[in-house]
């Protein structure tokens, strides 16, 4: 049985969306147990009772505007902190939260702990593409500054995730840069390019420009955390703007526009589904001793269900256990 600890109080739509997502997951998957951390009365308002769902009551929670490290130190009984402690103590196998990203990164690093040999765990997310296959990108903001060695490790981590969780046999790795030529970029990008080219354990396809990302040019995209976070938010904002503009044009158009939209209804639905990140799951802080997954702050029921499904797959494939073994080998070789 896969045991998943969930911060029921994190996110804009908590606890309603969190608990209703859990209800759907419990019905869909018979091999999971959920531990919900948070206000018992509020959780029970939405929970469909099940012997595979336990509520661990706490009144304390980390707010979205709390200073992450300080909040984790001071709020020892916060729902997010208790969920992370359950993982550390072996009472749960993974943690999910839609709450304060910085705080989740802090509990991931200082409570769950990083895998030996991983210098800087990266925030990884699967981003939809027009091909429908998506790509894994990291780092998406766990680290504001990175070295070439960090980015090289992200390529290894991303490839490992793509192989073991998404089932891609030989994932193509691209380095996000301001041009495709190998001479492009700042010193960080140039140094990273050399490391990736020299590593024959990954399938490096070279530099990739931001405009190529949505076309599926690579299965894994490597970036420093600052740039990756900016690109992710740009993609999300563009997708929301496109769908919003289409809706506005259809609603404000005449009868011909509405007839045309009706004829294109199925195509527009497919387009919306392609751009919908809520079905892709959450962002994984990859490189830790257990799955620590950040669901979007505005996650709805569908997004929470998708994140639980994602974590279930991670536990089913034992991707973290395999990663520990992989880096143990690397450490022995380097020693």
Swiss-Prot record:
Keyword Transferase: yes
EC number: 2.3.1.274
Compartmental location: Cytoplasm
Top-rank EC class of the record's enzyme: transferase
GO molecular-function terms, A-Z: phosphate:acyl-[acyl carrier protein] acyltransferase activity
Domain of life: Bacteria
Protein family: Belongs to the PlsX family.
Protein name: Phosphate acyltransferase
Gene: plsX
